[in-house]
Amino acid sequence: GVLDAFRKIATVVKNVV
């Protein structure tokens, strides 16, 4: 769902930072 996509993106951003 939308929340899953958002959480996935947030995880990627967190990994990059």
UniProtKB/Swiss-Prot annotation:
Protein name: Uperin-3.1
Keywords from the UniProt entry: Amidation, Amphibian defense peptide, Antibiotic, Antimicrobial, Secreted
Residue(s) carrying Valine amide: V17
Keyword NAD attached: no
Highest taxon listed in the record's lineage: Eukaryota
Its job: Shows a medium antibacterial activity against S.aureus and L.mesenteriodes.
InterPro entries xref list: Antimicrobial_8
GO cellular component terms, semicolon-separated: extracellular region
Free-text tissue specificity from the UniProt record: Expressed by the skin dorsal glands.
Any single biological process term in GO: defense response to bacterium
Primary residence: secreted
Subcellular location: Secreted
A Pfam family per the record: Antimicrobial_8
